[in-house]
Design a protein with these regions (language model features):
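Beta-strand/loop edge motif enriched in small/polar residues
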Residues: 1-249
């Protein structure tokens, strides 16, 4: 059963991890410069403290295979951005079953791309893969380059709410083989689709998509999607349903 996410709850990292016996890596607060890839293995956890700015060098990625909390606060958010404004970083990836229950809240990710790590291609600047109970709240993901997806969720369960995706190089969000809920999202200026679904089961409400160069919602490959209280404006196509998919509006 999917854990219920209380958006108003203060996920204090020390309390959240107190029952864990694994090693916990802590980044921040303040500036953290990553000049080479940081990989957290599946027997460890990662906490990023409120008020942290992570500066990633050219092509550098953060891959975490254990449970992860980006513990930003509204008044003390987390920033993940380029060390050099002209050189994109790679990806932030949360991957694998031991990362179950990871949380991203009050974070802005900008200026990443794509990466090939440990014999796996991560196509989203922010990549969530093969995990369960992923939660993202009150965050912004923007200004990626090269990569097909700004946020890519694959083989995972999730809830994503109160977040903004903009200036996307390809699809702003790509859900593959995943299931979950999305609430109160703003999606602006995607060069391809606003949201692309493949073999996914998603309940979406209060989604606003503006200026998708292709489709606002692209629903394909036997997906089962419910959309309510949502709108698509200034886009090439509002909603496309194909490949034996089901859409309830």
């Amino acid at each position: 059963e999917t854990e219920k996410f209380d958006e108003n709850k203060d996920y204090e990292s020390s309390k959240y991890f107190k029952h864990m016996k694994n090693k916990v890596h802590v980044l921040g607060p303040g500036e953290v410069v990553l000049s080479s890839n940081l990989i957290i293995n599946n027997t460890e956890e990662l906490v990023v403290k409120p008020g942290t700015t992570i500066l990633l060098a050219d092509g550098v990625s953060l891959l975490t295979k254990g449970r992860t909390i980006f513990d930003g606060k509204p008044e003390n958010p987390i920033l993940v951005k380029r060390l050099d404004k002209d050189k994109p970083w790679g990806v932030v990836a949360i991957h694998g079953p031991m990362s179950k229950g990871s949380i991203i809240k009050n974070v802005t990710f900008s200026g990443g791309s794509t990466s090939f790590l440990e014999n796996r291609l991560f196509s989203g600047m922010l990549s969530i893969s093969w995990t369960e109970n992923f939660f993202m709240y009150n965050s912004t993901v923007e200004k990626n380059v090269i990569s097909d997806d700004t946020l890519h969720v694959i083989h995972s369960s999730f809830k994503i709410s109160n977040s903004h995706f903009r200036n996307c190089f390809g699809d702003c969000i790509d859900f593959d083989y995943s299931r979950g809920k999305i609430r109160r999202l703003k999606i602006n200026n995607s060069k391809n689709d606003g949201i692309d679904f493949m073999r996914s089961d998603v309940d979406a409400s209060h989604i606003k998509i503006l200026s998708a160069k292709d489709k606002g919602f692209s629903i394909g490959e036997m997906s089962n999607i419910k959309i309510s209280s949502s709108e698509v404006d200034a886009s090439e196509i509002g909603v496309a349903v194909k490949d034996m998919s089901l859409l309830e509006i």
